[in-house]
Amino acid sequence: MIRFAPRLALAAALAAISAIACAQEITLRLVSAFPENQFYVKRTLDWIADVNKDGKGILQINFIGGPKAIPTFEVGKAVQTGVVDIGFSTGAFYTNVMPEADILKLSETSAADQRRNGGFDLINKIWAEKGNMRYLAKVVEFTPFHIYLNKKIDRPDLTGLKIRITPVYREFFQSMNAQVMTTAPGEVYTALERGVIDGYGWPIHALFDLNWQEKTKYRVDPGFYNAEVSLIMNLDKYKSLTAAQRDYLDRKARAYEAQNDFWKSYNQSEAKRQAEAGIQVIAFDAATSKVYVEKAKEIGWANAIKASPQYGPQLQKVLAK
C-alpha cells in the first residue's frame, strides 16, 4: 500500500488542478430579442462561436434562443433581473426598464466616438443605475430607419394610415397623424397580410430576413435616426466574473463592435435588393426632406429630455453632433 501512496497523491493533485481549471471557466446564457433567422442574430451566433473557440477554460456563451425563449419586449427585464446573463436587443425593446434605452436611436456620433468622448461611460453609468446592466457593445449602427408602406403618399402625412411602431417611431409618426400600434417583429408579416396595418417603421435592412418584402410596396426616403442593436449584460453577473473573464468578454465585445463599418456597404446592397424586389421609393423634394429629417430629430430629442430630464441633456452632449 505504501508503494501506491505517491501515485494516489499525484492523482489527487491532478484532479484538484483540473477542478480549479474547470471552476475558472464560466458559461453565460444569451437570449436574442430578434428572431433566430434574422441576419443580426446570425452574425451574433458567429461571434458566439468565436468567443467559445478562443475562450476555452475562461468563458463560454450558450445561446438559448430568440423570442420563443423569452418574448421580445421582456428581454430587457430578463437581463435586469438575471433570468438571463446577456441580451441581444435594441433599446426600443426595453423602455419598460428605462426610458433612456430609446435615446440611443438619436446617435450621430459613432460607437467608437462614444468610447472616446465619454459617451460609453455615461451609458454604462445610466444602465447600471437604472437597469442593473452592463452595456457591452453596440454592434449595429450607421443604419437609418424608414417608413415602409402599402399605400402611396406624396408628402409627410400619414393621416388615415395604420402603422406598426416600436417606441423608436411613436411620437414622430404621430406628428404625421398616423394611427400607431406596437407589435413584435415576428407579428408584422401577418398584420400586413391581413390588412391590420398599412405599413411599418424599420431600418433600411432586414426586410428579407422576415419576408416583409412580399407585403411591402413602398419605402419612404430619406431615412432618419440611427438603428442601434447591442449586447447588454446583467450587472451582478458581470461583476461576478473574474478579472480575466471580464477582460476577455470586453475584448471580444469591442472586437465585434469594431466591425460596424460593415453596415454601410450592407445597407447599400439591401436598398438595391429592395428595388429588385419591386419596392418603390417615395422620395420627397430636397426642402421637404430637410424639414422631415430635422423634425424627426427635434421630436426625438424633445421626448428624450422630457422622458429623462436628468440624463437626456447629458446624452445629447455625447450622442448629437
Where are these regions (language model features)?
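Bacterial N-terminal signal peptides that target proteins for export
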Residues: 1-10
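Secondary-structure junction/capping motif
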Residues: 5, 38, 98, 117-122
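Absolute protein N-terminus
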Residues: 1, 23-24
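Hinge/lid segment of periplasmic solute-binding proteins
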Residues: 118-132
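N-terminal secretory/targeting leader peptides
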Residues: 10, 24-113, 128-321
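N-terminal signal peptide c-region/cleavage motif recognized by signal peptidases
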Residues: 16-23
